[in-house]
Amino acid sequence: MEKQVRVRYAPSPTGHLHIGNARTALFNYLFARHQDGKFIIRIEDTDVKRNVAGGEESQLKYLKWLGMDWDEGVDVGGEFGPYRQTERLDIYKKLYEDLLERGLAYKCYMTEEELEAEREGQIARGETPRYAGNHRDLTEAQVKEFEAEGRIPSIRFRVPADRDYTFKDIVKDEVAFHSNDFGDFVIVKKDGIPTYNFAVAVDDHLMEITHVLRGDDHISNTPKQMMIYEAFGWDIPQFGHMTLIVNESRKKLSKRDESIIQFIEQYKELGYLPEAIFNFIALLGWSPVGEEEIFSQEEFIKMFDAARLSKSPALFDSQKLKWMNNQYMKKQDLDTVVELSLPHLVKAGRIGETLSEQEQAWIRDVIALYHEQMSFGAEIVELSEMFFKDHVDYEEEGQEVLKGEQVPEVLRAFAGQVEALEAMEPAAIKAAIKAVQKETGHKGKNLFMPIRVATTGQTHGPELPNAIALLGKEKVLXRLQKVIG
């Protein structure tokens, strides 16, 4: 009988959920759900100094916002807990003590200064820096001497000599490492806390993880973890290392890269939709059959085949994300779009936090003008700018339009029509423009463009009668008068 698929996403609470981690979580989630397996969240919080307040809560909050759920974890429990590494220290202790007893690990009393001097010497000689094994076989007398000096040891794993470590990677196919390329590595730090490679190997085994899907930057950790599995006689899970995400300059995506918004909470704050972010991230290093790019979560689960994980770096295309979010925005009802937009208009000082019924209806109509055009909620501030300014600046193209010989005649006639209107309704504005056509004989672009540029400042924009109606009589007449002179 085949084992049930069990995968995990194991963040460190050293920061908030960013694109790279979100992709790792998402691919594990899709892999598990596609195969009716289990998706586990484990918190790797042993690097206590780097943990940030609220980091764990933020990770879980934004995974949920993206639409993911999990079967086991810190907040939902499960039979393989605890799911927080700092609550598993006794488990690790028993196991590393077993390695010490069997001579597969040993105490190393070298100081940071001694290790740094060794490293610098290796670099100066053109060698690859690695631990040279100075404390591999200490005598009892040497150990007593170091302890008398008050030295606190770390524990190192004794790397087997002359061994090949080969594994079939789900993404990269066969990957090989040689043990002689590794020095004996630390499995327990001087403070008694296990290192990443030891704790991860132990947890993955005890939690019965069948597949380890993670970023390419972890591939050099794999042979070390394989050595630990081997030392305990444990079955080794299947590994899959997803390719890097690169920016538009084809450089590895870095948290310090300011050209790209990195954190999921920032996208939420900007008024992006979780379904669109889910869709976009799911295509960063994985592709379905065919050309279609918009899929629901259920569709992704149904078709997610790990064999289609890409071997090439995944390009993070910000413009494509905007396009994709726009596709999802178009499908939303107006209430949702208004809800995504209002906080940004308040933040920009365009509207107050409390609105009268009349103001609510007006701003709703303004947002409706841009529903089809908006890429994300915060974009409404820039798109709707003309409604909140007394005067408009004309685009270069618009300035050329206003130089036309017919412009004064058209605008005077239109101003007269607007002046006579009892109510600024789109139908009435449409009728007023038709009346100007009849009165002046101008039509098409010669008629519409001067009116659009004079009233909105733009050569392109939303439906003109609707926009003019929402601008209001006073603002429209003031703008027309400015051009007429």
Curated annotation (Swiss-Prot):
Residues where ATP binds: K255
Subcellular compartments: Cytoplasm
CDD domains named in the record: GluRS_core
Enzyme class, broadest EC rank: ligase
Major localization class: cytoplasm
Keywords: Aminoacyl-tRNA synthetase, ATP-binding, Cytoplasm, Ligase, Nucleotide-binding, Protein biosynthesis
PROSITE patterns named in the record: AA_TRNA_LIGASE_I
'KMSKS' region, short sequence motif: residues: 252-256
GO biological process entries: glutamyl-tRNA aminoacylation
One Pfam family in the UniProt entry: Anticodon_2
GO cellular component, one term: cytosol
EC number: 6.1.1.17
Catalytic activity: tRNA(Glu) + L-glutamate + ATP = L-glutamyl-tRNA(Glu) + AMP + diphosphate
GO molecular function annotation: ATP binding; glutamate-tRNA ligase activity; tRNA binding; zinc ion binding
Residue positions of motif 'HIGH' region: 11-21
Keyword Signal applies: no
Coiled coil: none
Subunit field text: Monomer.
NCBIfam families to which the protein is assigned, alphabetical: gltX_bact
Its biological purpose: Catalyzes the attachment of glutamate to tRNA(Glu) in a two-step reaction: glutamate is first activated by ATP to form Glu-AMP and then transferred to the acceptor end of tRNA(Glu).
Similarity comment: Belongs to the class-I aminoacyl-tRNA synthetase family. Glutamate--tRNA ligase type 1 subfamily.
Name by which UniProt lists this protein: Glutamate--tRNA ligase
Name of the coding gene: gltX
